Amino acid sequence: GLVGSEMCIRDRIDAINAQARKAFPDLEFREAYTSRIIIRRLKTRGVVKNTPLDALLQLRGEGYTHIIVQSTNIIDGVEMESLRRDVESVLPFFKEIRVGTPLLYSVEDAEKVTDILGQRLNASVQQSAKKKGKEHFVLVGHGTYTPGTATYSQMDYMLKVAGFGNFHVGTIEGYPTFETMLAQLKAAKAKSVTLVPFMFVAGDHAKNDIAGEWREMLEKEGYTVHVRMEGLGQIPEIQKIFVDHIRFGLKHRT
């Protein structure tokens, strides 16, 4: 099953589902959402979505014995912990349940994402009108209060090591903070900044916090600010990493 947590922009979720179905034509797929707020919102529009627990119990009722649960989370944070708890609660009902890893789990995952985003975003500037000075990109993640927040700092570090010195990572609710990221922009003498959601879907969170608050705060500091409303789930190479995690989960016990 594929698990989504942000306000669903349907085609983003559908795109990764399509990639997964194509890669594993013999598997039965179910979709679930970890956010009860999103589930409630969708219900008011007549769209019914299960929580992971509901989806698992439904599969049990249909007689399935071997399950792999793949999340679309970016880091191994609170939502992954909650998902694993749900899985543990129904373990006795199945012969086996495996849980696939989030996007950024291994060093190799982070290196791949660094390369994908670095190349893609730098290329997006080269295609547009040639600007004076270098465009700086700020990847904005949700953030978390668990040790998983270190993943964001790792991404910031890896981007710079890979030669993408014009990339900086910040989080809305964790570390690196807005202030930490701002200090980096100042040190780099940046003038023009593009904000990019470091989230699977660029939903309400991204619109309010990134296109709203962060943009305003940076403009107050004197920066020219652009916003690129593209969630990670839109990028085919990122979708492929999630599909690879399913493949790994099918081959190895996790």
Regions flagged by a language model, labelled:
Residues 10-68, 76-194, 199-204, 212-254:
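Non-catalytic structural scaffold of enzyme domains
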